């Protein structure tokens, strides 16, 4: 089973939407969101709306899709602390590396927040990637400032020798000035391919998804 870690240039860049689109595009694929904050109680259990989308799409138990759940809608390390818990990045890494799902050929692992979001007092998603070496798919929320955010993310990948499989342009605002020019700028400056594009909540448009 191939595994990909889906991260983004920012919070609310559209990771969950794009991840769901990838699962729709690829047969025999599934998605999980191992850590989620901002959960609410429903039927006597904590539920995160993003993880619930994956669970409903995959028809997997919520405990498989989202084993680490916390209440407050803040950074995972703060939300866990507020719940009297802590996140062990090694346990998260082991879970994501060892999870086996019948008939699934591609597993998309959605992170919470961006690459440098703290999971505990020492570790971030970057440390998770150093442990697992799972290749990354970068979701770029196309908005003002995205070029800077994306190039900074690329710098972190390169310094830490993290493999990025490619990036997806998630077009959030149909009124964004010079949208196509922004995408072209990123294509010229990034060292990994543009895999796909999504337009304002529409279906994913394949550009280079066959490389996954």
Swiss-Prot record:
SUPFAM superfamilies the record matches: P-loop containing nucleoside triphosphate hydrolases
Record-annotated active site: 33
Residues given in the record as substrate binding sites: 37
Cofactor(s) needed for function: Mg(2+)
Broad enzyme group: ligase
E.C. numbers: 6.3.3.3
Pathways per UniProt: Cofactor biosynthesis; biotin biosynthesis; biotin from 7,8-diaminononanoate: step 1/2
One GO molecular-function entry: magnesium ion binding
Domain of life where this protein originates: Bacteria
InterPro entries: DTB_synth_BioD (IPR004472), P-loop_NTPase (IPR027417)
Catalytic activity: (7R,8S)-7,8-diammoniononanoate + CO2 + ATP = (4R,5S)-dethiobiotin + ADP + phosphate + 3 H(+)
GO BP annotations, alphabetical order: biotin biosynthetic process
Residues that coordinate or bind Mg(2+): 16, 50, 110
Pfam families listed in its UniProt record: AAA_26
Subcellular location: Cytoplasm
UniProt keyword annotations, A-Z: ATP-binding, Biotin biosynthesis, Cytoplasm, Ligase, Magnesium, Metal-binding, Nucleotide-binding
Cellular component GO terms held in the UniProt record: cytosol
Gene3D superfamilies membership: P-loop containing nucleotide triphosphate hydrolases
Major localization listed first in the record, in broad terms: cytoplasm
Family affiliation: Belongs to the dethiobiotin synthetase family.
Assembly and binders: Homodimer.
Family annotation (NCBIfam families): bioD
Protein name stated in the entry: ATP-dependent dethiobiotin synthetase BioD
UniProt source species: Legionella pneumophila (strain Lens)
High-level lineage: Bacteria, Pseudomonadati, Pseudomonadota, Gammaproteobacteria, Legionellales
